[in-house]
Regions:
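ATP-binding N-lobe of GHMP and related small-molecule kinases
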Residues: 1-41, 220, 232-243
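Short glycine/serine- and small hydrophobic-enriched flexible loop segments
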Residues: 15-19, 52-60, 154, 170
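DPxDG-like acidic metal-binding loop motif
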Residues: 43-67
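Short, hydrophobic/aliphatic alpha-helical segments
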Residues: 25-37, 72-81, 181-192
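C-terminal nucleotide
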Residues: 111-243
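Short coil/turn connectors at secondary-structure junctions
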Residues: 26-29, 89-90, 97-98, 121-124, ...
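Alpha/beta catalytic cores of group-transfer enzymes, especially the acyltransferase/condensing modules
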Residues: 68-113
Length: 243
């Protein structure tokens, strides 16, 4: 079954990895992707799709996989599909569970979480959509920004999640020669945003602010002429929200 939104044939890879793990597939089933998350902009749509598909198979076949097992299958599926270099374990955790996590992708998901914490829901989140990724990702350029990435890690270790996000985004912008992203992020932070950063490897940008600053930040973002999505942090488990 072809799913037009599945550009990397990720769902085929999910089925292959699921079967290779010795898990049963339903006799008759099909896929449909229902999502407002744009693809190819650093918003982790591949991790979300793979986790959702594996959770759906888990429910349909009464397999009883836990979160860590679902994450491991998601990582393997994304690698098999070729839509990630690292396996995107961090992104898979973000897709399936609330809060934030610092993970070691070299470890199985069960042992991968190094630090984790919660983010309160009383913030506004904006996503600036700047089209699909056009720049090639050069791993050496990312290595050149090691000092800034280390600053991000230090902030996270000290509990400064938003500072960590901004520093990480600054490093990614420098590594991808994205001067526009740096200008946008610096501008919204100067106008009161708590954080502004490229998401993933870009080019989308996330902005976090207090709810009382929402109108001002919206006005600043409107000047960019890009499409803006408003979102929020969710500390509730997805299953609880569905109920």
């Amino acid at each position: 079954q072809d799913v037009k939104e599945d550009l990397h044939s990720l769902l085929d890879s999910v089925e292959i990895i699921w079967s290779e793990a010795g898990l049963p597939l339903p006799d008759n089933f099909g896929w449909q992707i229902v999502s407002n998350v744009p693809m190819g902009q650093g918003l982790k749509s591949s991790s979300a799709i793979s986790c959702a598909a594996i959770k759906a198979l888990n429910i349909a076949t009464w397999t009883g996989l836990n979160e860590s097992e679902i994450i491991d299958l998601s990582v393997s599926s994304q690698r098999h599909a070729g839509c990630t270099v690292t396996g995107s374990m961090d992104d898979s955790w973000a897709s399936i569970s609330p809060g934030w996590k610092l993970v070691d992708p070299s470890q199985p998901a069960k042992y991968s979480i190094l630090i984790e914490g919660e983010i309160k829901e009383d913030y506004c989140v904006f996503i600036i959509l700047r089209g699909t990724r056009s720049n090639e990702i050069n791993s050496q350029k990312f290595n050149d920004q090691l000092t800034i990435f280390e600053r991000s890690l230090s902030s996270l270790s000290n509990g400064s999640v938003f500072h960590a996000m901004s520093a990480n985004g600054m490093a990614v912008a420098a590594a991808t020669d994205d001067d526009e992203a740096l200008r946008i992020c610096n501008n919204v932070i100067a106008n009161g945003a708590l954080s502004a950063a490229i998401t993933g490897s870009g080019p989308a940008i996330s902005v976090v602010c207090f709810k009382q600053d929402k109108a001002l930040i919206e006005e600043v973002l409107s000047r960019t002429q890009y499409e803006i999505i408003e979102s929020s942090f969710q500390e509730s488990d997805l299953a609880e929200m569905i109920k």
